[in-house]
Amino acid sequence: YNHTAEGNEFGPTLCFRGIDNAAYYRLVDDAKEHYYDTTGTGNSLLMRHPHVLQLIMDSLRYWVTEMHVDGFRFDPAAPRARPFHEVDKLSAFFDLIQQDPVISQVKLIAEPWDVGDGGYQVGNFPPLWTEWNGKYRDTVRDFWRGEPRTLGEFASRLTGSSDLYEHSGRKPIASINFVTAHDGFTLRDLVSYNDKRNEANGEDGHDGESHN
């Protein structure tokens, strides 16, 4: 629920752009013909508009009550915390989740970042949420590569990352520890290369993360 398939303002009209562009999408304040993009996909949904919030909540409830889905992963999740420009964990989206008798009872997993300013929000999501722990991922990668001064950080990540979650009263289960995912290096590439080698796929090395 962070973007639709239109891409940016030069893409085709495939979804809500043709219904009510200004209601469903975040537009640049002083240039409404352009999308404000914090997702890296060309557009971002307008998370303070009632129609957008209703769309999200209605569809989530449908998946739980009719399809018996027991949890959701939000990729990325930080755009849902941007009713305006800044990330706000008290935004309407999180309030609706917290108060909903159905959705508040299922698993909620956040990829806690986006490409906007201040978008890296690991450790800052509300109590109902678990988070992909990007600090665990980066620390384990550094440790495997023999980077200096990572042993203490490595121990902290293995024992629950209390520096990230304890301040909000959350327990170690709030952290989803991972090393690789569908974004960036595969596990084999991770232990084989320091830099990405994507030239052969036609993107000339511009796609994917460079970090290892």
Predicted regions located by residue number:
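Substrate-binding/active-site clefts of carbohydrate-active enzymes
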Residues: 1-68, 73-99, 119, 164
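Conserved alpha/beta catalytic core and glycan-binding cleft of carbohydrate-active enzymes
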Residues: 68, 81-84, 89-212
